[in-house]
Structures are given as structure tokens and as C-alpha cells.
UniProtKB/Swiss-Prot annotation:
Superkingdom in the source lineage: Viruses
Organism: Gallid herpesvirus 2 (strain RB-1b) (GaHV-2)
Quaternary assembly: Homotrimer; disulfide-linked. Binds to heparan sulfate proteoglycans. Interacts with gH/gL heterodimer.
Membrane side Intravirion: residue ranges: 753-865
Role description: Envelope glycoprotein that forms spikes at the surface of virion envelope. Essential for the initial attachment to heparan sulfate moieties of the host cell surface proteoglycans. Involved in fusion of viral and cellular membranes leading to virus entry into the host cell. Following initial binding to its host receptors, membrane fusion is mediated by the fusion machinery composed at least of gB and the heterodimer gH/gL. May be involved in the fusion between the virion envelope and the outer nuclear membrane during virion egress.
Protein name: Envelope glycoprotein B
Alphabetized Pfam families for the sequence: Glycoprot_B_PH1, Glycoprot_B_PH2, Glycoprotein_B
GO biological process: symbiont entry into host cell; virion attachment to host cell
Keywords: Disulfide bond, Glycoprotein, Host cell membrane, Host endosome, Host Golgi apparatus, Host membrane, Host-virus interaction, Membrane, Signal, Transmembrane, Transmembrane helix, Viral attachment to host cell, Viral envelope protein, Virion, Virus entry into host cell
Transmembrane segments: 732-752
Disulfide bonds: C49-C530, C66-C486, C140-C204, C298-C346, C553-C590
Length: 865
């Protein structure tokens, strides 16, 4: 009864929860509520496993034979010299001869000077002048003769005659670059005003500088930027020198044997003769000492000296590993002949000398050389000169074995180093003999016109070294792991035999890699494949109790699932790992305080007292791991060092022109050969007076006398004009002149206004105060106002009338004068003048004479005032 009440309460709680949670879930059963916790089809898959009947049986594999661990690669030791392509240019000294011609056209004004044109050109110096004057006397001619526009033209320094000028050092000489020249001034002629003049300057310049040429040495460039299209090794003899390229007519080239050049600083001839080349171009002549090509240049150059080089054979190719460089170089096993490289004559000489030096300082007491120096062409265009070495203790062991076997010839070969013994396996001497006998005699040959090109970076070699290091470590590690794994599997096979007896289905599923059901049939197991069931067709039931019994319960939860299409629901039990059991055989006696977790999909279904409680997330359950960690040995630390094939200096020096040096020389050219800080003051007035004096001096004594007068007057005029010009050029003088002009304009404007005022109203202009008083009095009288007694008594009527008469006569006199002036201008003869005079007399007699006013006033007048 207690069990029944508890189930009823559980069902009521589930139904009430479903009713309150959603109004649309009314009238649902408890089975449907439990079904709502089922999985979607994406979350998990269930399997239906039929019972095995023995149609398919399996057995466990017997133990395997485990492989042996991998043997490490054996390396031989030796000394190696690495060669790379020589990209540096061939440098040599040249002497440049040329004459710098500057023609300057000037224009002289009255107060200024201008350079209207400046023409500059370089002309070559003849070979005869070089041999006779420059290297013979340390001098150079002031005359320049050159070809322009198919015509020979001549130029003379300072427009004077030809002369031999001493060569003097320039102001900026260095041990690498020296120069000499004949003058440091640019000749400039300033003529008289309004005249063009032209002056010519010829500066003979000798420059000693560096020149460069790169492979294939068909031309060379000089430090100043000039380029000569001729090989520096060209010559008339020997025949190989005459075969060098030359891009000029043969007449422009000359080679002199036993030539003694002069040191222009010490003024002494050289003590040793040389074979001297001279080349004439359109703008310069260049000379240099000839030398054989094979003794001066080499297409390869020494890059690195490796004191400890390891060599091994991997996949039919040599691996040269240099730990100190962190690089590995790969080559064929056939030797390479460096004599076949064009201009590669230096490889053997430098390699043998460097190897001998390293062996003498480091290996002489502990090792012996084995065979001769071997040469190999490595990937990337590098030559590896390799000298195998062998420790003395190991060599003594070989000698004792040879002496014991009475093999005298081989012993002598080893002692005399006639064979290159390479120790691939040091376990037996027969292997060494076989290596010597089977060593290939073929050598790689190149065409005579072939040159080796080296890469500019050895990152590939460093990566190869890193790869070989990692490959060796990983391969050894995997070899040991494979052996240990095989042995572990053989030992665990016993556990598998025992496990399949305890749980055949789980063991068979683990070994076959798929879900199967199994049972033991003696020494073999019968299996049957499981079928996947969709998660949507699987429903978990809420009770694990057997309905027909009160004390029997199911040990696994009950489920309903459907299998296939148009199939009804099948009731079964939930097995392990989402396995569906189509039977109800898993039962147990009911126990108190029952609590179980069963895997259902990706989560766990919790049952308490054989009733479903809730779904528990798998993440909420702690994991007990059975995985055994594999602790492997880590790689040892290996630093990748930066390694450059070519340095910055080599890359910067790869071209024939150093543009920084060319730009620097061009900027210093004027400073080296011309004094640009010297200032020459030119007086154009003196030139003008000197020209006039020379003109009159050519006319004899009379001309000289006239010239003195004219030159004196002209000098005064020029001095006056120069003074005025100097005053005007002064800013204060110009300001004063401007102020004076402005003041004059203002004064002229005021005078013009006064004259116009005098013409229009003379009395107002002459007597402004009197006219103002009279105007005011007339205004008051016009308006009927009476003046004060003072004003009325201050004016004498008689005097006023006399003043009026005086003004009238003054006007008549002025009119008469104007009339006379007009008559004289018209020049009409004496009749007009006489008639005018008679008119004056009539006017004069008709009017009373003007009486002068008394100077004193009478008493009556004073009383009136």
C-alpha cells in the first residue's frame, strides 16, 4: 500500500507540473511526460543487438614479431672549405687624362655684369703628350686640340699662345684618389659697357682613381662615372689578351712595353717597368697597367672554413653537416673537378692552403689525413672542398689488422694516403676495402664557358640542417615507440583473452571497432552486428518495477522503441552504452534506498527507488580517466644562427659604379681643380675710360691732347652719374628722393590753387580779412540790422571812397598791361600801339588824379573815431 501511495503522488506531481507549465498539455499521461525528456536525433544513436547464434565467429590475433630499433646514421669527420660565386668586381688603378675647356661669354652693362653663356667640354690628351710631357717632364700643354663635328678645333688657355704648364696637386688628395692640374682659375673677360666678350680656360687634369669591372670583364667603369667599353685585360700580346673584347678602333689603343710612369708628387720616374695600356676616347684618355687575367680574377671565392664537417650518405647522396654553421649541404657522391670552371683556378690553391693550415693547428696531434682533398658541387652553387680525417688510434688499429693479415699493399696505401678511405661502418676493414674498390671514378665536367652561380641566401641549407636534425630525432623516437608499442601489445594480449571471457560483447566491439554482440563458443566468440536506431523512436519508461510482482524489479530501465518502417513499438530494456535489449530478462530483487544512473543518449537518467527522477548532464559527473600519458623526450635546444653568403659590403660593391662615390666626386670636382672662393673685383668704369684713352692714344700727340680733355670730361660725367647712381642705390637716398618728390607735388598743388583763387577773386586772395569784414557788414545791412556805434564810427566814408578809386586804377593798370601784351603778341605794327596810347591819354585826362592819403589824421578825425 505504501508503494502504491508513493507512485500515485509521483504521478500527480508530474501531471500538475505539466498542467501548470503549459495550458496546451491537458489530459496527458505520465508516460507522455516522461517521453518529453527523450533525445533529438542529433544528440545520440541507439543500437539494437540481436543475440549471436554462431554464424560468425572470431578469434584473437597471436603475438607479433616486433621490429628492431632504427640504427642512427653514421657520420664521417673531416675538414671542409666552402666556396661561393665571386660577385665582387675586379678593382684596379687607372689614370685619367683630359683637358677641361670652359668658354665663358659675358655682357657688361653700365652698372651690372652678366654671364650670358658658359660652355664646358672635356677633350682627350694625346698619347704623345702623355709620354713626352706628363710622364716625361711633369708638365702639360695649355693648348687643346680635339675633334668636334668632324672638324679639328683648337683652344688655348687665357686666349694666349701655347706653353708648357707645370702640373700641381689638387686641393683634395687621398691615398685612393689623387689628381693634378695646371690652373685653378676660370679665365673670364669683362669688356666695356654694352659689349659681349668671350674668354677661354684650358685646364689639363690628370686623375688617378679606382676602376671596376665585373664578369665577363667586357668593360670597366671609373670612380668618376666614366665607362670604357674595353676589357681591362685587353692587350696586343699574348694571344689570349688580344681575344678580349674591345669596342673602339684599333688606332685609339696603344700598348707600351717597359714603360716608366712618373710620380707627379715626387717628380720621379718609377723604378720598375710595366706594360702600360692607353685608350683614347672622345672625352678622355685612360691608362692602366696590363696584367694577365688568370692571375687577377677568379670566378669563385672562399666563403667559410669549417673545422668539423660531418659527412654521411643518405639515399645515394652526400650530406655535409656543419654544426658550427647550423647548415647542411647536399651533393652527389661523384667528385667535381674545379679545373673545369671558367676562371676557377684559385679553388684548389686556396682550399689546399686553408686545409693544411687548419690541420696543422688543430688535428696534427690527434688525426691523420685520409686520401686527398675531394671537391663536390653542392646544391645552391657551392663548392665543398672536403678533406677526410681519421683519428690516430683508429688508424693504428687498422694498421695492426693489416700487418696481422700480411696485406702490405693496403697498408702502404693507408700510410701514404693514396686512397680516400671513408668510414661508413667501422666494424671491419673489409668494408673499407670494398668502399675503396667500389668508389666511382666518374667526375662531373662542365663546359669551358660555364660559370657557377651561387644563391644569395643559405636558408635552404640551414633548413636542411634543421630538418635532418629533427628527422633523426623523430625517426629514432618513433622507432623506439614502435618497438615498445609492439611489445606492449603482445603483453596486453593475455588481458584481452581474459576480458573476452568476462564480457564478450564489449571486448569484441573494442577489437572490431564497431558495435557487436558476442558470446563465447569455446575458444572462439560468436558475434552479431548491431543496428542503429534513431533517437526519436526510443522512449524511456518511468518505472523499473515488475507489475506482476511486488518484490521483483528490473535491473535496467524499460524502453519502448520501434525498428524499421511500419513496425510497432517494441518493449525492451536499456543496455550498456545506449544498447537496446529486446528482452526483459535483466531483473533483480527490489532493494531499499535504490539509486542508479543509466547512460541514455548523451546524458544520464537518474532513478531512485526504481522510479525516474531527472536527467543529469554528463558534464556534472566527474571523470575518472584510465588514459596513460606518454611522456616523450623533447628536442634539444638548437639555435638557428643568421648566416649570410654575401655581406652588405659585397652586395654594395657588386656593380661597376659606386653611385655614392660618383656623386661625391662630382660635387668635389670644382673644389679640387678651381678656386671658387677667390673674388675678382671688376671696375667697368675703369674699363670704359681705359678704352677711350687707348682710342685717343692711337691718334698721335693731337689725339692725346684731345683725349685728355675728353677723358677728363667723361670721367667727371661718369663720376657724377656713378655718385647719383650710388645715392639712388642707397635705400635712405631713395627714401629721401621720394619724400622730396611728394613735397614738391603738394607745393605745386597749393600754388596752383592760390593762382586760380587770385585770378577769380584777387581782393579776397590779397586781403582775406578785409573782405570777410566787408562781407559781414553787407550781410547785416541787407537784413536791416543796425551796426554798433563802434562799427559805424570805425569806417571813414572818404577813405573808403579813395580806396575804391585806388582799386579801380589798379584794375585799369592791370587791364592796360594785358592789352599791351596782347598787342605785342599780335605784332600788328605801330598804328595799334599809337591808337592804344591815345586811348590811354583820353582816359587819363577824363578822370581826376589820384591823391595820396595824408599820413596823419586831424583832430576832428580823431574825435570822430
Amino acid at each position: 500500500m505504501h508503494y502504491f501511495r508513493r507512485n500515485c503522488i509521483f504521478f500527480l506531481i508530474v501531471i500538475l507540473y505539466g498542467t501548470n507549465s503549459s495550458p496546451s498539455t491537458q489530459n496527458v499521461t505520465s508516460r507522455e511526460v516522461v517521453s518529453s525528456v527523450q533525445l533529438s536525433e542529433e544528440e545520440s544513436t541507439f543500437y539494437l543487438c540481436p543475440p549471436p547464434v554462431g554464424s560468425t565467429v572470431i578469434r584473437l590475433e597471436p603475438p607479433r614479431k616486433c621490429p628492431e630499433p632504427r640504427k642512427a646514421t653514421e657520420w664521417g669527420e673531416g675538414i671542409a672549405i666552402l666556396f661561393k660565386e665571386n660577385i665582387s668586381p675586379y678593382k684596379f688603378k687607372v689614370t685619367l687624362y683630359y683637358k677641361n675647356i670652359i668658354q665663358t661669354t659675358t655682357w657688361t652693362g653700365t652698372t651690372y655684369r652678366q654671364i650670358t653663356n658658359r660652355y664646358t667640354d672635356r677633350t682627350p690628351v694625346s698619347i704623345e703628350e702623355i709620354t713626352d710631357l706628363i710622364d716625361g717632364k711633369g708638365r702639360c700643354s695649355s693648348k687643346a686640340r680635339y675633334l668636334r663635328n668632324n672638324v679639328y678645333v683648337e683652344a688655348f688657355d687665357r686666349d694666349a699662345g701655347e706653353k708648357q704648364v707645370l702640373l700641381k696637386p689638387s686641393k683634395f688628395n687621398t691615398p685612393e684618389s689623387r689628381a693634378w692640374h695646371t690652373t685653378n682659375e676660370t679665365y673670364t673677360v669683362w669688356g666695356s659697357p654694352w659689349i659681349y666678350r668671350t674668354g677661354t680656360s684650358v685646364n689639363c687634369i690628370v686623375e688617378e682613381m679606382d676602376a671596376r669591372s665585373v664578369f665577363p670583364y667586357s668593360y670597366f667603369a671609373m670612380a668618376n662615372g666614366d665607362i670604357a667599353n674595353i676589357s681591362p685585360f685587353y692587350g696586343l700580346s699574348p694571344p689570349e689578351a688580344a681575344a678580349e673584347p674591345m669596342g673602339y678602333p684599333q688606332d685609339n689603343f696603344k700598348q707600351l712595353d717597359s714603360y716608366f710612369s712618373m710620380d707627379l708628387d715626387k717628380r720621379r720616374k718609377a723604378s720598375l717597368p710595366v706594360k702600360r695600356n692607353f685608350l683614347i676616347t672622345s672625352h678622355f684618355t685612360v691608362g692602366w697597367d696590363w696584367a694577365p687575367k688568370t692571375t687577377r680574377v677568379c670566378s669563385m671565392t672562399k666563403w667559410k672554413e669549417v673545422t668539423e664537417m660531418l659527412r654521411a650518405t643518405v639515399n645515394g647522396r652526400y650530406r655535409f653537416m656543419a654544426r658550427e654553421l647550423s647548415a647542411t649541404f647536399i651533393s652527389n657522391t661523384t667528385e667535381f673537378d674545379p679545373n673545369r670552371i671558367i676562371l676557377g683556378q684559385c679553388i684548389k690553391r686556396e682550399a689546399e692552403a686553408a686545409i693544411e693550415q687548419i690541420f696543422r693547428t688543430k688535428y696534427n696531434d690527434s688525426h691523420v689525413k685520409v686520401g686527398h682533398v675531394q671537391y663536390f658541387l653542392a646544391l645552391g652553387g657551392f663548392i665543398v672542398a672536403y678533406q677526410p680525417v681519421l683519428s690516430k688510434s683508429l688508424a693504428h688499429m687498422y694498421l695492426r689488422e693489416l700487418m696481422r693479415d700480411n696485406r702490405t699493399d693496403e697498408m702502404l696505401d693507408l700510410v701514404n694516403n693514396k686512397h680516400a678511405i671513408y668510414k661508413k661502418n667501422a666494424t671491419s676493414l673489409s668494408r673499407l676495402r670494398r668502399d675503396i674498390r667500389n668508389a666511382p671514378n666518374r667526375k662531373i665536367t662542365l663546359d669551358d664557358t660555364t660559370a657557377i652561380k651561387s644563391t644569395s641566401s643559405v636558408q635552404f641549407a640551414m633548413l636542411q640542417f634543421l630538418y635532418d636534425h629533427i628527422q633523426t630525432h623523430i625517426n629514432d623516437m618513433f622507432s623506439r615507440i614502435a618497438t615498445a608499442w609492439c611489445e606492449l601489445q603482445n603483453r596486453e594480449l593475455v588481458l584481452w583473452h581474459e576480458g573476452i571471457k568476462i564480457n564478450p560483447s564489449a571486448t569484441a566491439s573494442a577489437t572490431l571497432g564497431r558495435r557487436v554482440a558476442a558470446k563465447m563458443l569455446g575458444d572462439v566468440a560468436a558475434v552479431s552486428s548491431c543496428t542503429a536506431i534513431d533517437a526519436e523512436s526510443v522512449t524511456l519508461q518511468n518505472s523499473m518495477r515488475v507489475i506482476t510482482s511486488t518484490n521483483t524489479c528490473y535491473s535496467r530501465p524499460l524502453v519502448l522503441f520501434s525498428y524499421g518502417e511500419n513496425q510497432g513499438n517494441i518493449q525492451g530494456q536499456l543496455g550498456e552504452n545506449n544498447e537496446l535489449l529486446p528482452t526483459l530478462e535483466a531483473v533483480e530483487p527490489c532493494s531499499a534506498n535504490h539509486r542508479r544512473y543509466f547512460l541514455f543518449g548523451s546524458g544520464y537518467a537518474l532513478f531512485e527507488n526504481y522510479n525516474f527522477v531527472k536527467m543529469v548532464d554528463a558534464a556534472d559527473i566527474q571523470i575518472a580517466s584510465t588514459f596513460v600519458e606518454l611522456n616523450l623526450t623533447l628536442l634539444e635546444d638548437r639555435e638557428i644562427l643568421p648566416l649570410s653568403v654575401y655581406t652588405k659590403e659585397e652586395l654594395r660593391d657588386v656593380g661597376v659604379l659606386d653611385y655614392a662615390e660618383v656623386a661625391r666626386r662630382n660635387q668635389l670636382h670644382e673644389l679640387k681643380f678651381y678656386d671658387i672662393n677667390k673674388v675678382i673685383e671688376v671696375d667697368t668704369n675703369y674699363a670704359f675710360m681705359n678704352g677711350l684713352a687707348e682710342l685717343f692714344n692711337g691718334m698721335g700727340q693731337v689725339g692725346q691732347a684731345i683725349g685728355k680733355v675728353v677723358v677728363g670730361a667723361a670721367g667727371a660725367i661718369v663720376s657724377t652719374i656713378s655718385g647719383v647712381s650710388a645715392f639712388m642705390s642707397n635705400p635712405f637716398g631713395a627714401l629721401a628722393i621720394g619724400l622730396i618728390i611728394i613735397a614738391g607735388l603738394v607745393a605745386a598743388f597749393l600754388a596752383y590753387r592760390y593762382v586760380n583763387k587770385l585770378k577769380s577773386n584777387p581782393m579776397k586772395a590779397l586781403y582775406p580779412m578785409t573782405t570777410e569784414v566787408l562781407k559781414a557788414q553787407a550781410t547785416r545791412e541787407l537784413h536791416g540790422e543796425e551796426s554798433d556805434d563802434l562799427e559805424r564810427t570805425s569806417i571813414d566814408e572818404r577813405k573808403l571812397e579813395e580806396a575804391r578809386e585806388m582799386i579801380k586804377y589798379m584794375a585799369l593798370v592791370s587791364a592796360e598791361e594785358r592789352h599791351e601784351k596782347k598787342l605785342r603778341r599780335k605784332r600788328r605794327g605801330t598804328t595799334a600801339v599809337l591808337s592804344d596810347h591815345l586811348a590811354k591819354m583820353r582816359i587819363k585826362n577824363s578822370n581826376p588824379k589820384y591823391d595820396k592819403l595824408p599820413t596823419t589824421y586831424s583832430d576832428s578825425e580823431d574825435d570822430a573815431v
